[in-house]
Amino acid sequence: FALNISVLRGALHRSILTSYLFCRIVDTVEDAAKLDPKIKIKLLMEFSRLIEDPGYRDKNLTAWVEECKTVDGSASDLELLHQTQRVFNVFDSLATNHQDQIIPSVSKMAKGMAFFQSRFQFGEITPLGNIQELEEYCYFVAGVVGEMLCNLFFQKLPHLSETARNTMRQNAVSFGLGLQMTNISKDIIADRDRGWSYIPKSIISEKGLTMDEFHSGISMDKNLQILESLLCKTNGHLDDALKFTLALPRTEIALRLFCIWPLWMAAKTVSVLHNNPDLLKSKAPVKISRSTVKRILLGTPFIAWSNNLLKVSFGNIIDDKVLQNSPVFDREGLMSRLERIPLDTVNSNM
């Protein structure tokens, strides 16, 4: 989101930038490849309390930042961890109605990450069991972001029609899930090297492969079939994300571009990944070209006002009939399952 945040202005820009930094902070803890999962869980659960309780934060934030010295990652991510107090200083200056949208989403993200870390087997590849678990994981790391953006947009658009609000509420989670599943699809090798497999074990088993056989590439044909099933589901979420975007007023060009840019790039990425064996052969990431990114950034502002032109443009990105036949997302089913996950009782002793 770093690129598209730049198109925003004013209070919304400040709030979304701050929330993005919070998400990067917890993501850095979750992604630390050398850090014991028990320590990750402790840091993540502690962060959720820091953002929920200002009084607790005043007394304990310095100690939390000190504990984060054990986290490994890129120099920029570790510097952000070190500057967590500055991010909270900016957060405290935001309007209360914006803070109220950020707190529950970031807290839920941290707790959800901790929950999945409690299942991590250090030193071996830990798979997700099925599509339902994949949806649950993606909700905590990205679906909550879609909900938060939706609620922040509502603060800026007090006169938005109830019809548009309902459309956005129904598709906000898919906005996040579509982008996250795109990342999962293109990062299979990198995630495997970190010890995680976000490709559900059930999908792999359906094709007659074990986890080890899938990751060894013993059958490229079956591996591509497995990837296609995930891309098909991803494309369904991206279609829902388009509905979310088109519900924004046509006059709110900046808000639309904020959604259009990552959505178009995700769809382009899915089209590149489609039937692409290079994804499963090399550690070098399969990604869209800089020229493609440039065309998206330069071309979409001219059509952002038109729902019809946006639909045509988006439809032209992925024209394969297999990927267009996506399963319907059971949002209510996901929400029902999420209610049964005991987030507040996750601890590092699990």
Regions found by a protein language model. Give the residues of each.
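Acidic catalytic motifs of isoprenoid enzymes
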Residues: 1-242, 246-249, 312-330, 336, ...
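Enriched - but not universal
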Residues: 67, 264-267, 308
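Extended, well-ordered alpha-helical segments in internal regulatory regions
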Residues: 152, 182-188, 265-277
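Hydrophobic alpha-helix feature that most strongly marks membrane-spanning transmembrane helices
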Residues: 235, 239-246, 250, 267, ...
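Amphipathic alpha-helical protein-interaction segments enriched in hydrophobic
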Residues: 253-264
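Acidic, carboxylate-rich catalytic segments that either coordinate divalent cations
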Residues: 273-350
